[in-house]
Every structure is written in structure tokens, then in C-alpha cells.
Amino acid sequence: MVGLVDALGGGPAVIAGHDWGAPVAWHAALLRPDRFRAVIGLSVPYRPRGSVRPSTAMPQTADAIFYQLYFQAPGVAETELSRDVRSSIRRILFSGSGEGRRAHAGLGNPAAVGMVPRGGGFLRHTAEPATPPPWLTEADVEFYAGEFSRAGFRGGLNWYRNIDRNWELMAPYAGARVTVPALYVAGDQDLVVHFRGMDQLLPNLKKFVPELRGTIMLPGCGHWTQQERPKEVNDATLA
């Protein structure tokens, strides 16, 4: 990120990130406040370094495991997602959206809390939309499917496989706080905000991000914050 800022003129910059991009943005601001004057996290809030390896704290039961644990074994998720790349993309995008969450409300399946059934798969409790949501075009699906068909899913999944290593590398920063001005934006239907521990982290986020200027929860919005609600996200980031 520092190299990108250098290439674009030197900054200091405002950095924003969504999903895995959010920890990248939060930690860029944490580590280099001289190069990043503000930070915006979408979906994933800043989470201070815990006292145990992240993978050891992830939930699992006799029937299901947390999806990030499912992603750990090389080749397993890649094989599942690559069987039909276009269908996988449609299922993931729809099931994570506000529309998808409403369509599957009350089903009571393990996916409701980010769990993957043992002996099943990540896509088992997903479905392709009968009608795509208005923010998702077939051109979008074709582009994403083309890129994943070309490059595969391993690069993205390796982010999950590196969680414990990143935790090790951040040991010198245990207890560190993000000190630059910050904003957190998420949808109230985003599964991320319903993960275990979020009910304690989100109300106390300002303890770890003292210059947090606001937490914005978008009603009815799912995981794909900036796709589902582009105007609201743009308005919030420019305010």
C-alpha cells in the first residue's frame, strides 16, 4: 500500500478497504499513520491482536466448522468452487447480499453464522438467484468468472491460510490502536457483523480506534456494501 501511494504521488492518503481489504486498510493505517491520514473499513471492523492464534478460536461443532477453517486445507475449497465457476460466483454474491439473506430468513442452517456443514461444502446452503439483484449484472458475473477461471481461487484463499502467520508477525503491535481518523460502514444483514464476538467488539470499537468518527449500519444491506449501497457508501466516505 505504501508503494502504491508512492506511485500515485506520495500522499498522505485516505485508505479504504472491504472484506479482506478492510484489515489491509486498518493495518496500513496502524503501521504507517505517516502515510495514511485516515481509514475507512467496510464490513470488517478493526480487530486488535488477540492473545491466541486466530484459527484456535474459530468455532466448530460436531456438525459444522467455521468457513475460515474449511478454507485452510489446500485444494478443498478450490475444487468445490472451480466445479462451476459462474454458478459459484452467483451463489456467493447472492447469498451474502441483503436480498439473499432475506430470501433465506428463518431456514436455521449452519451457514447463518458462517458455518460449513461437515461432509458438505461452502456452497451447500447457497442458491443461485431466480432474479439477480439490481446491483449485480451478468457482465459483472462474467468478468469475475473469467478472472477466477484464469487465475484460480488459491490466491484469495491463501489470505485465510495466512491468518495465523499474520498474527505472529503482528506480535510487536499487541495492544496497539489505530490513531488516525476512521469510519466503519457495514450492512445490518452482513453475516460478518453477526459473527461470534462482534456483539462485544462493535460497541467498543472506539477503544481500539480512538479517532473513530462514526459507525454506520445500512438497514437491509448485506455483505457487498459498496455494490449494494453505492450512494450511501460514497456519501459517508466523502462527508
Language-model-derived ranges and their functions:
Residues 1-16, 20-213:
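Flexible "cap/lid" subdomain of the alpha/beta-hydrolase fold that forms the substrate-access gate
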Residues 28, 236-237:
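Hydrophobic residues on the short alpha-helix immediately C-terminal to a glycine-rich phosphate/catalytic loop
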Residues 214-221:
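Short glycine-rich catalytic loops that host catalytic nucleophiles or stabilize transition states
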Residues 221-230, 234:
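Catalytic histidine-centered segment of alpha/beta-hydrolase-like enzymes
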